Amino acid sequence: MVNMKSVALIVIVMMAFMMVDPSMGAGECVQGRCPSGMCCSQFGYCGRGPKYCGRASTTVDHQADAAAAAATKTANNPTDAKLAGAGSP
């Protein structure tokens, strides 16, 4: 028969599993990148949730970020567009 110590241990273990943060990480970022759907925190670890995807983190899609930054730079600096040949006859 199950004694009270066993029941208490089972309850404690179950409660510990429930208290685990659902945004737990999945290891370190590799060259600033994480598996799909995860973000790289400011400290270099992958995960989900505000601790990883907050303002101080980098997003998974670095290529889209770089393209948007380049487009903004070109739009804000017409000299770059001329040097790139934009608007040439």
From Swiss-Prot:
GO biological process, one term: defense response to fungus
Gene3D superfamilies referenced in this protein's UniProt entry, alphabetically: Endochitinase-like (3.30.60.10)
Domain Chitin-binding type-1, first and last residues per copy: 26-68
SMART domains associated with the record: ChtBD1 (SM00270)
Proregion residues excised on maturation: 56-89
UniProt GO molecular function: chitin binding
Designated name of the protein: Antimicrobial peptide Ar-AMP
Organism from which the protein derives: Amaranthus retroflexus (Redroot amaranth)
Origin organism lineage: Eukaryota, Viridiplantae, Streptophyta, Embryophyta, Tracheophyta
